[in-house]
UniProtKB/Swiss-Prot annotation:
Pfam family, one: Peptidase_M16_C
BP GO annotations: proteolysis
Domain of life: Eukaryota
Keywords noted in UniProt: Electron transport, Membrane, Mitochondrion, Mitochondrion inner membrane, Respiratory chain, Transit peptide, Translocase, Transport
Record's protein name: Mitochondrial-processing peptidase subunit alpha
Main location per the UniProt record: mitochondrion
GO MF, one example: metalloendopeptidase activity
E.C. designation(s): 7.1.1.8
Species assigned in the record: Solanum tuberosum
Cellular component annotations (GO), alphabetically ordered: mitochondrial inner membrane; mitochondrion
Record PANTHER family: METALLOPROTEASE (PTHR11851), MITOCHONDRIAL-PROCESSING PEPTIDASE SUBUNIT ALPHA (PTHR11851:SF190)
Assembly with partners or alone: Heterodimer of alpha and beta subunits, forming the mitochondrial processing protease (MPP) in which subunit alpha is involved in substrate recognition and binding and subunit beta is the catalytic subunit.
Catalytic reaction(s) noted: a quinol + 2 Fe(III)-[cytochrome c](out) = a quinone + 2 Fe(II)-[cytochrome c](out) + 2 H(+)(out)
Subcellular location: Mitochondrion inner membrane
Length: 504
């Protein structure tokens, strides 16, 4: 039996060898080194029919190797005759993000239009003079797009994200929704009901309440306007108010159409016919910030007490050195919660983690925050603590702010780590095409141009411990703004806390 099997294998080996010789007899590319195959596995023999990997194949053209360095795409900007800016940055990404940015937010609201920006955010991509809301939804779905709208104190933002094949449709849709809103009465009423629900929801969110409270208490005038409509103002909002607000503020010189992932010439050909007929009118002067400081307290039956201490950032983004220093300072101080749902390790070496959260189990959350605008801003610390520890937690916040006003208190290793973390955050965020588009739009509205990212990275590298101390000294010399929610009666008085900074 075994002899028969052996003879059959010998016959197979002979036939296979003949086939190999016939196939490659005319080729000079026969492998000189044997390699295994199916019959090698069966018989233990070797085959010499495989071409070596270093042998060039005939009629195969290799693509040129990628360069070691590719220069980043530059932002190209064109200003139309009516003052509207069109800006774009090309990329190899198959998708594009386009945004229409308007220099208009809650600081432009008047007593007659309080809450308009909140309602406008809800009314985005609703019916226009040319399309019903259903048609808008269907057209967005048809190309797999994603649209968003957001309102801030200084800007209204409308964005569209989809494959770059559909850039003409994206630009046309954005232009129609922003330029030609119908503000149908029934749609406005429907969204007002949703705004009321949001107001009720946010009233139960202490962190949101504190952020709005430090603005309303800290500023007199437009910068104190709430981003949220209130029960008192919502009943005055209607389609007429929205139409008048848009007509006054949505003007060509105050608009930027920005895109990431689009070739500029093609983008301009699509955008110019759709936006060049917007009226060119004189730009309204931006409201001046009036910072006064103040105290807001909301007594509530809650397990935790929430508080925030804040000071003005004079100059805002227009004071570049100070704003970059504050960005590093926020990363340096850091903070977070005593429990991290995303897992441990995030920000564990920041000052507020090491010196506060790791030392005081009664404190559940403690972090630095900032809200920076064109010409002003706020910087401070917010915390959440058990109610019986409220006074001590406020005292800890005071000590931490005073500590960084002394350059000897800022460890160089910590500062270097904060600068690297700040640069990493900027670069990683800019990898998102939506963030890149927003960065273009916001910079053009603020500076009139887009500074390259290297410009800001150099500014961050230049920050020193003395710069940190100098900025903090300016901060805490301005009037204190204090906001609290929960068992506020046990917290120290505004004057008591404010005097701590004056007597430092």
């Amino acid at each position: 039996m075994y002899r028969c099997a052996s003879s059959r294998l010998s016959s197979l080996k002979a036939r296979q060898g003949n086939r190999v010789l016939t196939r490659f007899s005319s080729s000079a590319a026969v492998a000189t080194k044997p390699s295994g195959g199916l019959f090698s596995w069966i018989t233990g023999d070797t085959s010499s029919s495989v071409t070596p990997l270093d042998f060039p194949l005939n009629d195969v053209k290799l693509s040129p190797p990628l360069p070691d360095y590719v220069e980043p795409a530059k932002t190209q900007i064109t200003t139309l005759a009516n003052g509207l800016k069109v800006a774009s940055e090309a990329s190899v990404n198959p998708a594009a993000s386009i945004g229409l940015y308007v220099d208009c937010g809650s600081i432009y609201e008047t007593p007659a239009s309080y809450g308009a920006t909140h309602l406008l955010e809800r009314m985005a991509f609703k019916s226009t003079l040319n399309r019903s809301h259903l048609r808008i939804v269907r057209e967005i779905e048809a190309i797999g797009g994603n649209v968003t709208a957001s309102a801030s104190r200084e800007h209204m933002i409308y964005t569209y994200d989809a494959l770059k094949t559909y850039v003409p449709q994206m630009v046309e849709m954005l232009a129609d929704c922003v330029r030609n809103p119908a503000f149908l009465d029934w749609e406005v009423k429907e969204q007002l009901e949703k705004v009321k629900a949001e107001i009720s929801e946010y009233s139960k969110n202490p962190q949101h309440l504190l952020l709005e409270a430090v603005h309303s208490a800290g500023y007199a005038g437009p910068y104190g306007n709430s981003l949220m409509a209130t029960e008192a103002t919502i009943n005055r909002l209607n389609s007429t108010v929205l139409e008048e607000f848009v007509a006054e503020n949505y003007t060509a010189p105050r608009m930027v159409l920005a895109a990431s992932g689009v070739e500029h010439e093609e983008f301009l050909k699509v955008a110019e016919p759709l936006l060049s007929d917007l009226p060119k009118v004189a730009t309204i002067e931006e409201p001046k910030p009036v910072y006064v400081g103040g105290d807001y307290r909301c007594q509530a039956d809650a397990e935790m007490t929430h508080f925030a201490l804040a000071f003005e950032v004079p100059g805002g983004w227009m004071s570049e050195k100070e704003s970059m220093t504050l960005t590093v300072l926020q990363m340096l101080m850091g903070g977070g919660g005593s429990f991290s749902a995303g897992g441990p390790g995030k920000g564990m070496y920041s000052r507020l983690y090491l010196r506060v959260l790791n030392q005081y189990p009664q404190i559940h959350a403690f972090s630095a925050f900032s809200s920076i605008y064109n010409n002003t801003g706020l910087f401070g610390i917010q915390g959440t603590t058990s109610s019986d520890f409220g006074p001590q937690a406020v005292d800890v916040a005071v000590k931490e702010l005073i500590a960084v006003a002394n350059p000897s208190e800022v460890d160089q290793v910590q500062l270097n780590r904060a600068k690297q973390a700040t640069k990493s955050a900027i670069l990683m965020n800019l990898e998102s095409r939506m963030v890149a588009s927003e960065d273009i739009g916001r910079q053009l509205l603020t500076y009139g141009e887009r500074n390259p990212v290297e410009h800001f990275l150099k500014a961050i590298d230049a920050v020193s411990a003395k710069d940190i101390a100098s900025v903090v000294q300016k901060l805490i010399s301005s009037p204190l703004t204090m906001a609290s929610y929960g068992d506020v009666l046990s917290l120290p008085s505004y004057d008591a806390v404010s005097s701590r900074f004056r007597s430092k």
